[in-house]
């Protein structure tokens, strides 16, 4: 792979080609009310570019050869069997899964290598620590985690036979399906979350900040079938990082949407 930069301020251009070999192992385990997914991998990269060319890519004294370890684990469990003693014990086909706890931990370890900018881990914002600005900091090694409670409102409704989607002659489960036990074809999730992470640099310069980030917030997510989803997250920082101009209490609002046709 190739990385190129053009710096108009310092009138320099960076251009380097890298070779990367990587291996990743993935695992998935599913239960009736829980799921766990994880990955573990390593990568080795090298380049024949000289140090000046590497520096021109945007970071000084980066390693021409480096190795990293990347890992992640995601898990969710539904609390309904705990909060409802009658869950799954009746004759009804539908077993509501309404109250979900989701958690994840992922990160990267770069040993003592200084990585080229394209290989650094970025943190802050959507999908990492939502109370901080997007990609507010980057580093060589990092770890980030999330714990989140999700309330799936449509799954709490009483079961009924399927109806139809407006303007379309197609069955659509607005309510849980009493004939098959399937859940609704749509979901509206109210969530509360806590994100935390730490990011660091190898042999860092004074201006490279090793950062810890903590944030909390709430979110709303709407999905219709498998074709459309939209979500909003409102997060606020729980700690200050003066070097990044972030104060405790600063807020971020995130909107994401997808449509598959």
What label would you give each PLM region?
Residues 154, 196-201, 223-227, 237-241:
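Short Gly/Pro-enriched loop/turn and capping motifs at secondary-structure junctions
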Residues 199, 209-232:
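C-terminal structured "cap/appendage" subdomains that terminate the fold
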Residues 175-179, 205, 215-221:
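Short glycine-rich, acidic/polar surface loops and turns
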Residues 191-193, 228-235:
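Conserved active-site loop/cleft motifs that coordinate metal ions or position small ligands
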Residues 222, 249-261:
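Outer-membrane beta-barrel "beta-signal"
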Residues 73, 147, 195, 220, ...:
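Hydrophobic, well-ordered secondary-structure elements that form the walls
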Residues 2-185, 196, 200-202:
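C-terminal outer-membrane beta-barrel translocator/porin domains of Gram-negative envelope proteins
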Residues 4-8, 235-251:
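Outer-membrane beta-barrel translocator/channel fold
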């Amino acid at each position: 792979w190739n990385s190129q930069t053009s710096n108009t301020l310092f009138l320099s251009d960076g251009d380097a080609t890298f070779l990367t070999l990587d291996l990743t192992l993935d695992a998935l385990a599913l239960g009736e009310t829980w799921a766990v997914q994880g990955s573990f991998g390593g990568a080795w990269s090298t380049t024949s570019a000289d140090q000046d060319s590497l520096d021109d890519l945007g970071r000084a004294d980066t390693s021409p050869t480096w190795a990293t370890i990347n890992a992640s684990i995601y898990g969710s469990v539904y609390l309904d069997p705990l909060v409802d003693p009658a869950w799954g014990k009746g004759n009804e086909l539908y077993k509501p899964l309404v109250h979900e706890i989701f958690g994840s931990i992922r990160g990267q370890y770069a040993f003592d290598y200084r990585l080229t900018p394209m290989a650094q881990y970025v943190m802050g914002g959507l999908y990492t620590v939502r109370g901080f600005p997007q990609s507010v900091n980057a580093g060589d090694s990092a770890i980030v985690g999330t714990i989140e409670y999700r309330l799936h409102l449509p799954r709490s409704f009483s079961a009924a036979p399927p109806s139809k989607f407006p303007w379309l002659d197609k069955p659509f489960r607005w309510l849980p399906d009493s004939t098959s036990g399937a859940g609704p074809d749509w979901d509206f999730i109210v969530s509360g979350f806590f994100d935390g992470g730490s990011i660091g640099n190898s042999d860092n310069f004074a201006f490279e900040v090793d950062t810890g980030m903590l944030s909390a917030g709430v979110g709303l997510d709407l999905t219709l079938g498998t074709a459309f989803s939209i979500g909003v997250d409102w997060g606020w920082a729980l700690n200050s990082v003066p070097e990044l101009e972030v104060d405790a209490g600063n807020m971020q609002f995130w909107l994401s949407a997808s449509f598959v046709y």
